[in-house]
Amino acid sequence: MNNPYENWINFFQEALNTNIPSIEKIEELVYLGIGGSGIPGRILEILELPVKYQLFRGYKVKVNEKSTVIAVSYSGNTTETIFALLTSLKKTRKAIVITSGGKIEEIASKHNLPVIKLPKGLQTRFVFPYIFTYLIRIINEGLGTNYNVNELVEGIKDYSKLNEISGILASQIIGKIPIIYSSTFLPIAERFKQEINENAKYPAFYNELPEANHNEIELYSYPSPYTFYPIVIVSDKLDEESANLINAYKIYPLYQSILKNIASLTLLAGLTSVKLAMLLGVKPEQLNIIPKIREKTFKLFEGDINADQNL
């Protein structure tokens, strides 16, 4: 497999230069998505938006007439997101769809919803730069915020440094169970876990600081049949002290800018997972069980989705 993370700077740049539909004023924001299409909405929580923001990663959703819904499904056929969007449209007509096509684009067309198209032919987790860039552009227009979206590109220009760190991390992780901790960057700790799971087919977990200091930290006080490898994404002095106490590998954000750090840390997660996959001799792009559960999920919801589409 050609390493898709090597193309991220181009992906970010393309998303910056692509025209998107005009966005109406946003009073409340709801994000629908799951898996690789859901994690950009989770990472958006880091920004602490100036309006009520809710993330739903499943088929259950709560919206009202004030809600602007962003429904993201890379394939366009994510059952849970389709069901959640159809449920949302019973309460609000303010919705935006981000997809490469599929059933959700058909629904958007039927309901005259704006669509932002993603390129086809990639795994969902690899298109993060497109989705997240579009999200920032949407909130800048809909909320009147002024995030410098160009900082996403600037955050990954030091690719060689991130690549070097990823190699060190992967070599340290192999043979151990990584647990990634953070406070401010907790959503990126979750992304690290997901990337290692999907690309390397390897166990990984994450937890929140300082919450873990009051329970999970005791894992490191006694010998265990498992070899854990703690990693802390450091954002403050308490993160630093927590890392020192459990002898964790420390990841320091490279920048003062939150968008630069989101881009660089997310890229680091991807690079680390691919390096780990190479060490393990597994194919990052290959999925074995996920397609099976997608098919079973669709069969469970097929009748409800078809009924809602006909309303």
Swiss-Prot record:
Q: Is Hydrolase included in the keywords of this UniProt record?
A: no
Q: Which residues form the active site?
A: E198, H214, R294
Q: What class of enzyme is it?
A: isomerase
Name this protein carries in UniProt: D-glucosamine-6-phosphate 4-epimerase
Functional description taken from the UniProt entry: Involved in the synthesis of UDP-N-acetylgalactosamine (UDP-GalNAc). Catalyzes the conversion of glucosamine-6-phosphate (GlcN-6-P) to galactosamine-6-phosphate (GalN-6-P).
Entry's EC annotation? 5.1.3.42
Name the domain of life this protein comes from.
Archaea
* Source organism of the structure: Sulfurisphaera tokodaii (strain DSM 16993 / JCM 10545 / NBRC 100140 / 7)
Q: What catalytic reaction does the record list?
A: D-glucosamine 6-phosphate = D-galactosamine 6-phosphate
Keyword tags: Isomerase
The record's listing under Pfam families reads: bact-PGI_C (PF10432)
Q: Name one GO biological process term.
A: carbohydrate metabolic process
The text of the family note is:
Belongs to the PGI/PMI family.
User: Which GO molecular function, any one, fits this protein according to its record?
Assistant: glucose-6-phosphate isomerase activity
Instruction: Please indicate if the UniProt record lists Repeat as a keyword.
Output: no
SIS domain: residues covered: 19-141
